Amino acid sequence: RWLDRCIKRFNETEPLYGYIQSLFPIVQGCTYKDLRTEAAKFVADKGADGNAIGGLAVGEPTEVMYEMIVVVNEILPKDNPRYLMGVGTPQNILEGIERGVDMFDCVMPTRNGRNAMLFTYEGTINMRNKKWEKDFSPVDADGCDIDIITSKAYLHHLFKAGELLAMQIASIHNI
């Protein structure tokens, strides 16, 4: 199988640039419980540094995604990091953590930030909307430093003016 060849080659390869590398085999299987179970058992037996859960967050209902996370995480070693690939909404991250996921990656927070969309506790807001034009309250009074010192009106202005700083502030906020 490919994974066996991958692990063999990985173990034979010296770390690049003096940094230790880690291998996280990916559990696939779409939304089929039997395929995910088979893949998770196969991957769990390999003793890798961590394990990845892939092939989710690509259009299936979120409840089905959450169910597949549970199916896989019941099998994967609890003492290894479990990484859910491509999942990035705040709600999905919290649900993943609740189901035993340790790591996430996704372009969504920065892509949405670059497009004036901010994740907030009240939902997603569009900073290009005129309603923020005269709102001098902080982007997020309970957020990071940049959220506290940046007003919604200022961020709205930056987006309307096409300033790159707007994208940076919004991306930092979303992360």
Task: Tell me what each language-model feature is.
Residues 141-175:
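C-terminal extensions of enzymes
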